[in-house]
A protein has these predicted regions:
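Short coil/turn segments at secondary-structure boundaries
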Residues: 64-67, 302-303, 514-523
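C-terminal structural cap/anchor segments
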Residues: 437, 441-520
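Substrate-binding/catalytic groove segments of enzymes
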Residues: 186-190, 230-231, 467, 509-519, ...
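Structured, solvent-exposed acidic/aromatic patches
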Residues: 42, 74-127, 133-463, 496-497
Length: 593
């Protein structure tokens, strides 16, 4: 009943967003809506609804989309080169929408200050810090202190200078700190929190206690983000006791599922069916889950429709032309025909050299995988033929249908909404792994690295109901352990004192919310991800390039920021404004490469 009520509330919020608008540009159309609401007349509650929901959709879609591809958890075949081959360029990533949200947040803060509504001021400060920090995370230097002043005259208002990435982080941290006092007490101590406020808060239903934990948790996140550039031990230790305490504190928004804009982005209901079918499991994650006998695989992946076995006895002696045959629901592969036609069994240790690329495309080796009922596509397999991986034989690139590669689990992810579908922005599991990392450094965070590490794994299992609603699926899959204690007791999982072990499990736990996994990989190089031979530049990119709209509208200030970027050997002919250039956060760290 509680979950149903929350979905209803969020549906109402999305209706409110339609009325209020989600950007400065959209405000101009408000005069035509029958409610005749203008931004200045809009209630802070409805402004808050738009800021929260739109922030969740942007951040969440990125984490389950292109960044999930970058972190090799999911794979988009058939023209998915941005997703799975790292073909990033500045045309594909535009921050205009981020600044639209921040403009609304600025108005929310101003109105909340005018009404002296503490709760709303705190929310606006958290979201301002979060919004600008996201821009710094993905682009680097950007307009901040002089941004959002387009209605004012003056050169710096019309063409705002770019603040340094470092100062944007400092400002975000200051916002998170400034927000905390506004969340003092409980809901009963905040007369400004009305039923409308509760409905408009799509994350926590107007609960200041949870928002306060969130502010502290974001401080922890960004102190660790900066720890490779400056000493953050005292800061981390100062917030450790006040962060999320359970999965009930997770920062998330369930999908209303009423239309394409409020639904899980890859479901078929409001999209072309190929959108769901193109979004498959990446071999990097499926291999790791199988190696660890990890039961979370049953939550993530759909078993392949037709399992494969290599068996020469199913074919006539001397037959080296018949590649496959299906008998009683099993596909048999003819080893003689496979060898004669340049097919080879997938081997995770050698696959990057088993299949030559580029000038040798006419002699490429096609790979097949018979290892399990869960099969992912190897990262950067080759965007021209990845839809045919594992001897699919469909010949139809546009549909991406396959009986031999795992989609995301159909009854969960091919839906606009559902009990496990949400935009996930921060989690208790993430916080546990953050504290494990801090403890591994020798910092005092109220527990050992092993304790926090195990809690992080447990929180991930609980979040996805692995040993709850899906216990029977776990029990029915032969390739995984059946309970938490057995899982963490395995030598391949048990905490071994290394940062690598923490980051590997944190990466797995970031399923469908990979933004933090990407940030962690950038600053630590962990987990160590193999790059496929079909990748655009031979390495995972580090940032979003400044979009042409910004280069055209604010060229002088953009160029100053571009000149501060440090190019790498992977830039090719991009110039400094490359997704493989290093910004301040990575300069001098030798990470991730």
């Amino acid at each position: 009943m509680k979950g149903t009520k929350k979905i209803f509330i969020i549906c109402c919020v999305f209706l409110a967003i339609i009325i209020i608008g989600d950007s400065c540009q959209k405000f101009s159309v408000l005069n035509t809506n029958p409610n005749n609401v203008t931004p200045d007349q809009a209630s802070p509650d409805y402004l808050m609804a738009g800021v929260l929901a739109n922030s969740a959709m942007w951040y969440g879609n990125l984490g389950s989309g292109v960044i999930s591809g970058a972190m090799q958890q999911t794979y988009q075949d058939a023209w998915g080169s941005t997703f799975s081959d790292y073909e990033w360029d500045q045309q594909g990533f535009d921050w205009t929408g981020n600044y639209h949200i921040l403009a609304n947040d600025k108005l929310l803060l101003q109105k909340a200050q005018g009404y002296q509504w503490n709760f709303h001021q705190g929310v606006a400060l958290v979201m301002r810090g979060f919004g600008f920090a996201n821009i710094a995370d993905f682009w680097g230097d950007a307009p901040d202190s002089m941004a959002l002043n387009g209605s004012l005259t003056g050169t710096n208002n019309q063409y705002p200078p770019f603040d340094s990435q470092e100062s944007i982080y400092e400002n975000a941290i200051a916002d998170f700190k400034a927000a905390i006092p506004y969340f003092s007490g409980s809901m009963a101590d905040h007369p400004e929190i009305t039923p409308i406020t509760q409905s408009s808060d799509v994350f926590y239903g107007g609960d200041p206690v949870k928002w306060k934990k969130l502010a502290y948790s974001l401080l922890l996140r960004y102190y660790l983000r900066l720890s490779s550039k400056m000493d953050e031990q005292a800061n981390v230790e100062s917030v450790a006791a006040n962060v999320f305490q359970s999965i009930d504190d997770d920062w998330m928004m369930p999908f209303p599922g009423q239309d394409q804009g409020s639904s899980y982005q890859f479901c078929e209901k409001f999209n072309d069916a190929s959108g769901y079918h193109r979004n498959k499991m990446c071999g990097t994650l499926t291999m790791k889950l199988k190696d660890l006998k990890d039961p979370r695989i049953v939550i993530m992946a759909q078993p392949i429709a037709t399992p494969s076995v290599v068996d020469a006895s199913q074919f006539a002696i001397g037959d080296n032309t018949t590649l496959t045959t299906i008998v009683n629901g099993i596909r048999y592969i003819n080893p003689a025909a496979a060898a004669a036609n340049n097919y080879k069994q997938f081997d995770p240790a050698t696959y990057t050299t088993d299949r030559p690329y580029g000038a040798l495309r006419n002699t490429i080796m096609n790979l097949y995988d018979t290892s399990s009922v869960y099969v992912g596509i190897p990262i950067s397999y080759d965007n021209y033929v990845d839809f045919e991986y594992n001897i699919n034989g469909s010949g139809v690139q546009s549909t991406s249908l396959s009986n031999y590669v795992s989609y995301l689990r159909t009854d969960i992810y091919d839906n606009p909404s559902g009990p496990l579908l949400a935009q996930r922005l921060a989690s208790y599991s993430e916080i546990c792994f953050d504290l494990a990392e801090a403890a591994q450094k020798g910092w005092n965070v109220g527990g050992t690295a092993a304790t926090w590490y195990n809690k992080g794994i447990k929180a991930s299992f609980d979040t996805w109901q692995v040993f709850g609603s899906y216990q029977s699926d776990v029990d029915n899959y032969y390739g995984c352990v059946k309970d938490y204690n057995t899982y963490i007791g395995q030598p391949s999982v048990a905490y071994d004192g290394t940062l690598q072990r923490i980051m590997e499990q944190k990466w797995i736990a970031s399923w469908q919310a990979c933004n933090e996994a990407y940030m962690d990989w950038r600053r630590t190089g962990l987990p160590a991800l193999t790059i496929g031979w079909g990748s655009y530049r031979g390495q995972i990119p580090l940032r979003f390039g400044y979009n042409n709209s910004e280069l055209s509208n604010n060229p002088a200030n953009a160029q100053i920021a571009i000149d501060k970027l440090v190019p790498s050997t992977y830039n090719n002919t991009d110039g400094n404004n490359s997704s493989w250039s290093k910004f301040w956060l990575l300069q001098g760290t030798n990470k991730p490469w």
